[in-house]
């Protein structure tokens, strides 16, 4: 369960949230344009999966802003070249539009996913859900945050305490 809280006092989060909020707005505008029947470009990648102008626009935006924020970290993007990224030990992993098929079928079940990978582990991640106007943010081994764009409010996940001495009854 998420409980209302203050904004995290974390410079990493405070710099990334506005960048992701702008990317989310770009993606939402692209989606609204597409659903309204506006001009929209959809192509096929080499693996026959679709890539839209929304994928590419959000990808360009985030690549630019991540390079400004953390110039020392390369970005492994779903829309990028694998051969250049094989040996990276630390990088951003980006999917600028996770759920392209849902987007194309006008289902609002798509996200922007951004993770910081160190070694072989995700140490930080943000998942933005444009149509819900929320973002989930977390560090490895810490409770995640939720940010509501529309209400401009922060929430932190709270683990409910259970009485371990009371057995859990399952079934009849």
Where do the protein language model's features map onto the residues?
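Conserved protein kinase catalytic core
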Residues: 84-85, 101-104, 135
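Charged/polar positions on well-ordered alpha helices
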Residues: 25-26, 101, 127, 140
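N-terminal subdomain of lithium-sensitive/metallo-dependent phosphomonoesterases centered on the IMPase/IPPase/PAP
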Residues: 1-97
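Acidic beta-strand-loop-alpha-helix segment within the catalytic core
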Residues: 114-172
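Residues in and immediately flanking transmembrane alpha helices
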Residues: 68, 108-111, 142
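Glycine-rich active-site/cofactor-binding loop and its immediate structural neighborhood
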Residues: 90-131
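Well-ordered beta-strand positions enriched in small/hydrophobic/aromatic, beta-favoring residues
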Residues: 75, 92, 112, 170-171
